[in-house]
C-alpha cells in the first residue's frame, strides 16, 4: 500500500503500481485474494491488474460520493458493532483533518445487547453521532434509540427518529471538512416498519 486517501488507494501488486477507486484496507485484502486466484488460473498479469484497477465497491459497502461543496458521504451496510468499528477504523485512517459524523441505528426484533455497543463504537470513532431508526419492525423506534444511547459516555450526539430527515438534515449542514457515514442499511432499498417494507434508499437521499 503506497497511498491511502479519500480518493482511493495507490498500491504495488506484483511490482506493478495501480490505482484503485475504492477505500478501506480490507477491500485491498479482498483484491489481493482475487489477484492470487487469477495467478493460479494463469491469467495474464497485466490483464488481471487492468481489470482489478476498474473494480468498484459493492453497492452499499463503503460506497461514497463527493458533493459539490467537497463534503464526502459514505454509505455502508455495517449494522453490528464489529462491522461498524471496522468501517470507522478504515475511515479514520484516511480522514486527514476532516471530522466524522456518523448516522447509526439498530434493527428492531433483533439482539438488543448490541445496541449500546453500537453507540459506544460510534462515539469512540466519530466526532458526532446522529442516532436514528433502522428497520424498527414491531418495536417502537424510540425504545431502540434509547437502548443505543446507553452506550454513550458524552452528549456528543443527537436523536432524529426519521431516518430520511436525519440524512437530509446532516447533508445540509456538512462542509468540505466533513465525512458523513450513513451506516446500517447499505444496499437495502427499504425500511421495515411493522410488517411493511417502506421504500427507502440511503444512497439516493
Residue ranges and their predicted role:
Residues 12, 19, 63-65:
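Residues in well-ordered beta-strands of folded domains
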Residues 2-17:
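Acidic-glycine-rich active-site phosphate/pyrophosphate-binding loop
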Residues 1-2, 141:
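Short, charged, surface-exposed secondary-structure boundary motifs
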Residues 17-25:
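A short glycine/serine-rich beta->alpha loop
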Residues 7, 23-24, 33-205:
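ATP-dependent carboxylate-amine ligase
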Amino acid at each position: 500500500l503506497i497511498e491511502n486517501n479519500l480518493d482511493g488507494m495507490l498500491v504495488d501488486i506484483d511490482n506493478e503500481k495501480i490505482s484503485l477507486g475504492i477505500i478501506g484496507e480490507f477491500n485491498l485484502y479482498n483484491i489481493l485474494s482475487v489477484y492470487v486466484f487469477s495467478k493460479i488460473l494463469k491469467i495474464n498479469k497485466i490483464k488481471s491488474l487492468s481489470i482489478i484497477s476498474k473494480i468498484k465497491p459493492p453497492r452499499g459497502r463503503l460506497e461514497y460520493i463527493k458533493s459539490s461543496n467537497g463534503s464526502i458521504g459514505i454509505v455502508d451496510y455495517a449494522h453490528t458493532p464489529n462491522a461498524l468499528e471496522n468501517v470507522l477504523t478504515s475511515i479514520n485512517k484516511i480522514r486527514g483533518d476532516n471530522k466524522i459524523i456518523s448516522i447509526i441505528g439498530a434493527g428492531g426484533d433483533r439482539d438488543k445487547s448490541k445496541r449500546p455497543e453500537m453507540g459506544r463504537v460510534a462515539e469512540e470513532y466519530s466526532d458526532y453521532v446522529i442516532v436514528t431508526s433502522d428497520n424498527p419492525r414491531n418495536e417502537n423506534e424510540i425504545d431502540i434509540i434509547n437502548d443505543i444511547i446507553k452506550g454513550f459516555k458524552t452528549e456528543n450526539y443527537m436523536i432524529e427518529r426519521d431516518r430520511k430527515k436525519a440524512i437530509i438534515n446532516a447533508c445540509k449542514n456538512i462542509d468540505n471538512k466533513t465525512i458523513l457515514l450513513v451506516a446500517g442499511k447499505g444496499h437495502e432499498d427499504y425500511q421495515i416498519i411493522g410488517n411493511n417494507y417502506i421504500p427507502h434508499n440511503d444512497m439516493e437521499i
